[in-house]
Amino acid sequence: MAIPFKVLIIGGGVAGLTLAIMLEAYGFDYELLEKHSDVAPKLGAGVGLTPNGARILDQIGVWEMMCERSSPVDSGTALSPEGRTVIFNPNMGEWLQKLFGYKIHFLSRHDCLKILFNKIQQKSRVHLLKEVIKIEAGNLGEKGYVETKDGSIYTGDIIIGADGVRSSVRRELWRIADSESPGYIPKQDKTGIVSFYTAVVGIAYNSGLPEGGSARAYNHHRSYFFQEGREGSGEFYWWLCAKNEKTKEGVIPKLSSEVKEGLLNKYKNDQIGPDLTLGALYKSSIYSTVIPLQEFVLQKCFYKNILLIGDTFRKLHPVAGQGANSAIEESAFVADMLWDLRERGALHDPDSIQKALTEFQTERVVRTTALREDANLVQRMESLDNPVMKFMALKFIPRLNFVIAFLPQLGSSFTPARHLKHLRPPKVGLCPFSQDMKAKPLPRSPLATFSWVTVLILAASSPWLASKYFISGARSFTDDQASQLAEVLELYISILSVSISGMWVIESYKTSSLISPFTSSLPWILASNFWGWQKILPIYICFYILSSQSVVYYYMPQTMTDLGVAKALLPALLVVYTVSAVCTINESGGNTDNSWWFTADFAFPVVAYLSGMFLNATSTMPQAVDVVFSTIDIPYQRRFQNTIAFVGFVAYAALASQYGTTILNEGLNLLNIPAVKNLASLTTVTTLWCLYSAWELRRINATGTSVIRAWLTILSSTIFGGPAATLAGTFIWSKVELAKATSFHPTMQSTDTL
């Protein structure tokens, strides 16, 4: 007979109620304690439900009811401080549904909580007016005890704290941990609760704001957000987020009405629409309040059998709309965790529970830290925090393509999310979520990043160090022979530069490169031809390694955003470099002159871009989301890189057949020749880059090839096929592997679903 197991949930908000529904669906015993007299008071701001939360709500059977009481976000608008439209996209809702299966919906917090509460089958397990005052934690696998203000005692095998920012459970967890295990709770967890902004939130009727979408208004050190409530109701929710004069630390008590009135009077003349000011909006409001916007992510969210979720564990700035959705994700994680422990008969096994809770903590800290950083960046930009943010918000970003600049960033906040593994799978769109992918991106450790960058710098400088300290200076061939070898090697370096510039061009068309040092390949090519490829390539790769260490990086589309350019890669390559080769031969009279190759390096990205524009304008091909969020460009990349690899191999074979014996005999003494030194540096750097790429793919589980096998293949290819062919081959291999690993993959779905 199975040993009884009870979950004790503290808090009847979004996190607590969704967890209760999931536990009922999974057949777990539970009780829920809520300190207020009503789980769905008619107070508070609205709730935005994004695809990552919507798909879980769909699984537990409440999504349709949520939609009936909500308004879909069909469009997106951003306004300048003068009330002028700087961004408008009427297709946002349609695109989100196509990509992720669900639109964003917005409804009142009251309706959201009421729908969740009504879904609970055994309402006798929900106890109101039960304010927690003391907890006695049990060891893992044992029971814990909770005492409420009215003297009641409740027990549970695991205690889930979901009682919000001002959490009694968190306070008790810290008290117990500090008493029993001093130092377990990091100092940062207690001092890292901060507030940079204060918000006034309100509900207005028939305010004159546009229906059917969300709107944001930018202003100096403040911003606004507006959203229709239930569709057709005339109800609008609005937020004023104002930057505090000083950063506030610690859990902040409720703010007074004087603070609210002060902010409203200070900004009453702000233009938040063509014919609407904040003062006029406030006059049409039936409800308003002021709240401190606190932000934190705890590094420790459990101790013994107490686990924190929702706003008890982390608090995000509401500008990104991920607070409630993250709570839903965490509830799903906990429910699946308990199901899996039960399936293994490990609900009372301390080691198994410890491992499961540690996995929860690790994954959720990474996920919510990324969400917090993204939300903070968005708020700083919308409140024009400094001249750079002001320029980005009002001048630069409005000129960017919405599909390329906004949707991938928005999607990267959705797709790392989980869903319930043991209920009917949710609807899907073009974009897979984390459980649908083979790849399992994790943030790269700072130590690993530092190590790769350090080794890369040492590798790039190794030929210079070797030439200075390890060569004798004597060689057995004449200066004329050395000059001929140098000319041939310069020609091979030119071919290697084609492989490098081809990689740079492709990377410049990725969504993650849009606002980065990689947004254009031309500056890198210009610098390489001026200062040398052997000096610029290591800098590029160091920047690349540093910029790709976040987990969000791999949830962005990894392929090219312009199908026309992808199709034009190979034709542009053949035309530009064939012309360059012919001109070089005709003008040199048999001597190698690389000036035409330099011209070709500049011309290639320009010709590819112009050819792509022509193809997009004159032929029918997929556009917008059907390109950016697909792998349709991969075959064109493959042909392009295979051509470079073939030419690079032929050139290397010709070089090896003519000078291979000389190079082997002379060894390091050849480093006296600058061309040899440059090629040696480029070879070590490109080889190390290929080794890093293989290691990184394996680290995120994007390839089944072992690191040792991949490295041996890369080293063998470099020796026998040359660095140009190896770089091109490794680059396209990594692109194909990553594209497959971040596309839909057969989900490890339990056959025992409900």
Curated annotation (Swiss-Prot):
Pfam families: FAD_binding_3. GO terms for biological process: terpenoid biosynthetic process. It is a multi-pass membrane protein. Keywords: FAD, Flavoprotein, Glycoprotein, Membrane, Monooxygenase, Oxidoreductase, Transmembrane, Transmembrane helix. One of its GO terms (molecular function) is monooxygenase activity. Glycans are attached at N586, N616, N701. Its EC number is 1.-.-.-. The keyword Secreted does not apply. GO terms for cellular component: membrane. The keyword Transport does not apply. The chain crosses the membrane at residues 3-23, 446-466, 486-506, 536-556, 563-583, 595-615, 644-664, 679-697, 712-732. It is an enzyme of class 1 (oxidoreductase). It is found in: Membrane. Belongs to the paxM FAD-dependent monooxygenase family. FAD-dependent monooxygenase; part of the gene cluster that mediates the biosynthesis of the meroterpenoids nectripenoids A and B, as well as cochliquninone D and isocochliquninone E. The pathway probably begins with the HR-PKS ntnH that catalyzes two chain-extension steps to form a reduced triketide, which then primes the SAT domain in the NR-PKS ntnG to initiate three more cycles of extension to give a linear hexaketide corresponding to the polyketide part of nectripenoids. This is FAD-dependent monooxygenase ntnA. It comes from Nectria sp.
